[in-house]
Design a protein with these regions (language model features):
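Hydrophobic membrane-insertion alpha-helices, especially the h-region
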Residues: 6-23
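Long, charge-rich alpha-helical interaction segments
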Residues: 245, 249-266
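Short coil/linker segments at helix-helix boundaries
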Residues: 27-83, 89-133, 141-228, 232, ...
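Short, Lys/Arg-rich N-terminal segment immediately upstream of the first membrane anchor
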Residues: 1-5
């Protein structure tokens, strides 16, 4: 009997919260303030939970940590999606979960195919987050950095495989994707990342793109990226002449030498 009363009380409570939130949403929609439009599959759970959303999120985070420690990664993915639905407008949620999948979980696998599956899942998760947070410079930067770092052959054994899979599955070049998101980050006032650091990362991305094109024997492309990298560093040095955190002259000298070397090689245009 007591159990039935508790269940009935919870049902009534949830119903009350639902209708109160309907009223609040209705009020917001009639005001002049712009309100982000969630799709129905996301807005209904948010309305139902109302003030209990914080408790639900805390519970899900605890579950996520437990599933990660238990190496139950597919259950973890489901929980990640639930957390993102409950906190869609918090960029940190998307950043943390994307990094966890693309780095930590991917590291747990041995086969390149399995690693790539989780890297790809993490990238797509972050990209979904950019749709929900279209003005988050920090999320844009993290995604741009992931497209640069995860495909670095000096760091990751299967980076060349990841690069090829990205081309086949998404039709994307990781360096172009990296540059796209890094440049978007500069346009949206990042809160957690220094603008100078983002500008330097763009310079490095262009340089790594040139080196990668050289390895792939696409000399024309390597030269074009080298020229872009050199111009980017020159612009950076002009805009920030007092910055001593990076030896810009050393980078520009290395690029100039690489350009001279590439110009002596036979061309093979495979754009």
């Amino acid at each position: 009997m007591i159990h039935r009363k508790r269940v009935l009380f919870l049902v009534v409570l949830i119903g009350a919260i639902f209708f109160v939130n309907i009223y609040v949403v209705s009020f917001r929609e009639t005001s002049k303030t712009a309100v982000y439009r969630y799709d129905p599959s996301e807005s209904i759970p948010l309305l139902l939970l109302g003030g209990l959303r914080g408790i639900a999120v805390d519970f899900l985070w605890a579950r996520a940590i437990a599933r990660h420690e238990e190496k139950k990664y597919y259950e973890l993915l489901t929980i990640n999606n639930l957390i993102a639905k409950l906190q869609p407008d918090f960029p940190a949620v998307w950043i943390f979960q994307a990094w966890n999948m693309a780095y930590n979980i991917a590291h747990e696998w041995d086969a390149a195919r399995n690693k790539w599956k989780w890297i790809h899942t993490g990238l797509n998760f972050a990209k979904k987050g950019t749709v929900k947070n279209p003005a988050s410079g920090d999320l844009f930067f993290e995604l741009g950095y992931m497209y640069l770092h995860l495909f670095d052959q000096r760091v990751f054994k299967y980076a060349a495989y990841y690069r090829e899979q990205l081309k086949q599955e998404d039709g994307e070049d990781n360096y172009e994707a990296s540059l796209y998101w890094l440049r978007r980050a500069l346009l949206h006032d990042p809160k957690l990342h220094n603008v100078l650091a983002i500008e330097r990362t763009i310079c490095h991305a262009l340089w790594h793109a040139s080196l990668c094109a050289e390895r792939e024997e696409n000399i024309d492309k390597a030269l074009q990226y080298a020229e872009l990298a050199l111009n980017e560093w020159k612009t950076y040095h002009t805009n920030h002449p007092d910055d001593t955190s990076t030896n810009v002259s050393e980078f520009m000298s290395a690029i100039e030498k690489k350009k001279e070397f590439l110009q002596r090689l036979p061309r093979r245009d495979v754009w």
